[in-house]
Amino acid sequence: LVIETITSRNKEMTDTVTSTGPRLNEPAPAFDAPTTDGRKTLEDYRGKWLILFSHPADFTPVCTTEFIAFAKKHDEFTAMNTALLGLSIDSHYSHIAWMLNIKEKFGVEIRFPIIADLNMAVAQAYGMIQPGASDTAAVRATFIIDPEGVLRAMVYYPMNAGRSVDEIHRLLVALQTADENQCAMPENWKPGDEVIVPTPATPEAAMARAGEGYNTVDWYFSTRAL
């Protein structure tokens, strides 16, 4: 009986983990959803990086500050072959009215589409609905999807704290740079900083590391400039 109870609990925990959303380095969930710029599918973004992000509700102050920040970095994201796509469980008409309000009150134009996820299909698929926060509103979730449709990063913020768009931009730059240079990025890496050289995979490679011309502290820790 004790074994059965533990097994049942473990299964419940596993089900909770696996059913709450996508996983890193796996294909991002497909979607086909109405937006402020017509219907959009994940396949529409094939060949580009995509930042898909949710917010709790239109016409709310924290969300407004986030959208203004995303809008101000829109051109920088575009230059990085990256599209922005917002989402909330509000109507298409609410999104449009809010976009116009932001332009009128703050002088900022929102030039990226927003999904009107009234049936919560996309939000559920991406684990944007967190029952501990709300059953009817998405939390502040951010997903970075690469040009092959693979989920490369995801970040969740609570309802009462706005996300850092600068950090999302930094993370995107780090992912793209790591892919292009076959390296890893240290804590708080920024363009111009040295990068981490992959750790040797064999004893022979570890022994040879010191003579390879990197900035080597020990066999497992080497950096280099790009």
Protein language model annotation of sequence segments:
Residues 13-226:
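Chalcogenol-based redox active-site neighborhoods
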Residues 1-12:
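Short, Lys/Arg-enriched N-terminal segments with co-localized hydrophobic residues
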